[in-house]
Regions:
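Local cysteine-cluster metal-coordination motifs and their immediate loop/turn environment
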Residues: 1-5
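A short, basic/flexible loop-to-alpha-helix module at the beginning of a structural domain
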Residues: 21-40
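Beta1-alpha1 glycine-rich phosphate/pyrophosphate-binding loop at the start
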Residues: 7-10, 42-110, 153, 190, ...
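Short, hinge-like loop/turn segments at secondary-structure boundaries
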Residues: 81-85, 123, 145-146
Length: 213
């Protein structure tokens, strides 16, 4: 396009389309597969956890998101400047995930071993997407560590503990939310494959770490 006049600001066009959709009164919600009866616990309501829930719900799996804070969003809620990300927009996007079927269990840190094991017993899979986790916490959860986070398959997020997956900064330091979201989507595909008895490959072929989709 620049050969004709000026380049287009693609990201601003996407933002405009999203803003118009949210303001429409009936924002877009994707179709979901029939309920599978499978349940997934997600520890962390930041970008990776929210993205994972968005896709897992479309696969028909029930999702409960646990977070230590009183509002979901992670660093998007508590660290990004308001002029960069208005909170009414963020919270409207999160409500879409809730409308899709996600359950939020806020002010609910999962810290001790018994709480973590209870999630493993109650749910068919657990995704850890709680941001950077200290080595001492991994010892409490009895999860293998690898600098700078949980040791997990880089293509799928699968850990050495059956049914436990990890994504985002829980595995490696990620400074861009879009990369955490891409991680969450990949983990969601891997968890779906795990729950449906498929070979676990993640979604690397279809997920861009640059655009998160």
């Amino acid at each position: 396009r620049r050969e004709h006049d000026d380049p287009l600001a693609i990201c601003l066009l996407k933002r405009y389309a999203a803003d118009v959709d949210l303001a429409s009164g009936a924002p877009y919600l994707p179709d979901c597969r029939p309920a599978t009866g499978k349940k997934v616990a997600i520890i962390g309501a930041g970008p990776a956890g929210l993205a994972a829930a968005w896709h897992l719900l479309q696969f028909g799996h029930a999702c409960t998101i646990y977070d230590r804070n009183d509002k979901p969003g992670g660093n998007l809620q508590y660290a990004v400047p308001l002029d960069k990300l208005p909170r009414d927009i963020l919270n409207a996007e999160i409500r879409q995930i809730e409308k899709l079927g996600a359950t939020f269990n806020l002010n609910h840190p999962v810290q001790d071993q018994s709480s973590f094991e209870n999630l493993r017993k109650t749910y068919d899979a657990v995704l850890i997407a709680a941001g950077k986790i200290q080595p001492a916490q991994l010892q409490i959860w009895k999860l293998p560590a690898a600098e700078p986070g949980i040791r997990a398959n880089p293509q799928t997020g699968q850990t050495e503990v059956p049914g436990v997956f990890a994504a985002g900064s829980a595995v490696r330091e990620l400074k861009m939310a879009v990369r955490a979201e891409a991680d969450g989507k990949t983990a969601a595909y891997a968890i779906d494959q795990y729950l449906t008895g498929q070979t676990i490959t993640g979604n690397a072929a279809n997920t861009s770490a640059i655009v998160g989709c």
